Amino acid sequence: MREIVSLQAGQCGNQIGTKFWEVVSEEHGIDGTGQYTGTSDLQLERINVYYNETGTGKYVPRAVLVDLKPGTMDVIQGGPLGGLFRPDNFVFGQSGAGNNWAKGHYTEGAELVDQVLDVVRKEAEGTDCLQGFQLTHSLGGGTGSGMGTLLVSKIREEFPDRMMATFSVVPSPKVSDTVVEPYNAVLSVHQLVENSDETFCIDNEALYDICFRTLKLSAPTHGDLNGLVSIVMSGITTCLRFPGQLNSDLRKLAVNMVPFPRLHFFTVGFAPLTARGSSQYRAVTVAELTAQMFDAKNMMAASDPRHGRYLTVAAYFRGKVSMKEVEDQMVSIQQKNSQYFVEWIPNNVQSAHCEVAPRGLKMSVTFIGNNTSIQELFKRVGDHFDVMFRRRAFLHWYTGEGMDEMEFSEASANMHDLIAEYTQYQEAGVDDEEEVAYEEEPQE
């Protein structure tokens, strides 16, 4: 079976990751101690993608939990899922990264990384046929961004032919935690462009907007935001965890979604999202789901898909859904909004189906789009980066850990290149494709 090893780095990564395990364990009928209490054979059919079954019949997540300070780990171990994870898989330092990317990537994190890789190796050896890794982390802090990207590059070296998917929480000015977030984010994107195969961009600002506007929560907490993220993560991984007609794994997803290796940053969405009180007043139909999932207000990254074009789209429907209806809806959406899809990739909308609906819903859909408007998100972070870097503000924290200014300039340049590539393909028509291919050949 095609197993996935899951990594969580830093406070944000661990909180989102643990919420994800909460949702997935519930869907598979596994309680807080790892015992199976479910009712359906479907729950067990592909359970070993994410869980390891011990000799005593206990199911243990293939998860490695990493942080540079023990606080978050203590909370997880004391929480409802404390007995689920393997105790050896908690790897933590004592010092913290102090929201400093350099500490996570070069000093504190580098000291801990071998210990983490040992645990990762152990998990990888316990699999039949490892398909890849998924990392949950944020790009704004120190541990998730610095040490998270360090882990990605180390795992890349050791398992070059395995897939690497990341769920990355991008910082946003409205929900800012620290002033150096733009530095940490740009340095991380620089790494992810090279080393990740698929990155699902999640954005605190967009999550807040969804909580305010759609879910009508007056004061959203981080718990609400993490809940949204975990719903999406559960949806994206549905096809990996349950049998379905389009039984995708991470590699098939990448083949369908990534037309050029650097352009692997996806916008994700979920439908139906309704406020707690008003759900009983709405009928959920396939038409409504498709409309809501393409709606800009439903995107979990603060970039407006109407400002760009879709290179590729994948939609995962769950529950009792007629596939014919889904296909018809998808075709009609593409015909009505043809200007939002690039015409030089035919059939660029894939839909898959899984019969197991999420808890409390009859049907739902998870949306993954590779849209050129994701550049807005990078532009936003890049602009904040430039404003600070121009004045060399806060740089001594990074150079003090042994970093060089050149590294900042390189990361910034790489991000600007990425933005330029997205713009280029957004504007490319069918006829320009030959010229584009010609330009890309290396000049001697």
Curated annotation (Swiss-Prot):
GO terms for cellular component: cytoplasm; microtubule. PROSITE patterns: TUBULIN, TUBULIN_B_AUTOREG. Keywords: Cytoplasm, Cytoskeleton, GTP-binding, Microtubule, Nucleotide-binding. It is found in: Cytoplasm, Cytoskeleton. Its main location: cytoplasm. One of its GO terms (molecular function) is GTP binding. GTP binds at residues 11, 138, 142-144, 204, 226. Changing residue 54 to A: In strain: 22000, A128 and Nine. One of its GO terms (biological process) is microtubule-based process. Pfam families: Tubulin, Tubulin_C. Tubulin is the major constituent of microtubules, a cylinder consisting of laterally associated linear protofilaments composed of alpha- and beta-tubulin heterodimers. Microtubules grow by the addition of GTP-tubulin dimers to the microtubule end, where a stabilizing cap forms. Below the cap, tubulin dimers are in GDP-bound state, owing to GTPase activity of alpha-tubulin. PANTHER family: TUBULIN (PTHR11588). Belongs to the tubulin family. Dimer of alpha and beta chains. A typical microtubule is a hollow water-filled tube with an outer diameter of 25 nm and an inner diameter of 15 nM. Alpha-beta heterodimers associate head-to-tail to form protofilaments running lengthwise along the microtubule wall with the beta-tubulin subunit facing the microtubule plus end conferring a structural polarity. Microtubules usually have 13 protofilaments but different protofilament numbers can be found in some organisms and specialized cells. This is Tubulin beta chain. It comes from Microbotryum violaceum.
